[in-house]
């Protein structure tokens, strides 16, 4: 053990007294975890990352979900209102000749 620490700038050699070379070897014998895909994806597939911020994208999605029901309800009310009420725009009854004196 002293040969291993010989050239190191250490003041107290007892700092390394608990070091055991056997423990280092045991840790390196474990196999690393490997990702195994469960689906086959085409090799031509191109992965593109979105440039928008993740938080902003999430907030927009939540806002769309929240307001989708309101928007649908409003459209239904408008459709029902159009069938029973007269149209909002009314055809002009005055002729264009009346405004020529200006």
UniProtKB/Swiss-Prot annotation:
UniProtKB keywords: Acetylation, Phosphoprotein, Ubl conjugation pathway
Which parts of the sequence carry Phosphoserine? 33, 95
The cross-references to InterPro entries, in alphabetical order and at most eight, read: DDA1-like (IPR033575), DDA1_dom (IPR018276)
Is Acetylation among this UniProt entry's keywords?
yes
Q: Where is this region: Disordered?
A: 66-102
Output the GO biological process annotations, alphabetical, semicolon-separated: positive regulation of proteasomal ubiquitin-dependent protein catabolic process; protein polyubiquitination
Entry GO CC: Cul4-RING E3 ubiquitin ligase complex; nucleoplasm
Q: In which pathway does it act?
A: Protein modification; protein ubiquitination
Q: Which domain of life is it from?
A: Eukaryota
Which positions bear N-acetylalanine?
2
Keyword Phosphoprotein among record annotations: yes
Q: Which Pfam families match?
A: DDA1 (PF10172)
Compositionally biased region (Basic and acidic residues): 66-75, 91-102
What the protein does?
Functions as a component of numerous distinct DCX (DDB1-CUL4-X-box) E3 ubiquitin-protein ligase complexes which mediate the ubiquitination and subsequent proteasomal degradation of target proteins. In the DCX complexes, acts as a scaffolding subunit required to stabilize the complex.
Subunit composition and interactions? Component of numerous DCX (DDB1-CUL4-X-box) E3 ubiquitin-protein ligase complexes which consist of a core of DDB1, cullin-4 (CUL4A or CUL4B), DDA1 and RBX1. Component of the DCX(DCAF15) complex, also named CLR4(DCAF15) complex, composed of DCAF15, DDB1, cullin-4 (CUL4A or CUL4B), DDA1 and RBX1. Part of the DDD core complex containing DET1, DDA1 and DDB1; the DDD core complex recruits a specific UBE2E enzyme, such as UBE2E1, UBE2E2 UBE2E3, to form specific DDD-E2 complexes.
The similarity annotation says: Belongs to the DDA1 family.
Q: What is this protein called?
A: DET1- and DDB1-associated protein 1
UniProt lineage: Eukaryota, Metazoa, Chordata, Craniata, Vertebrata
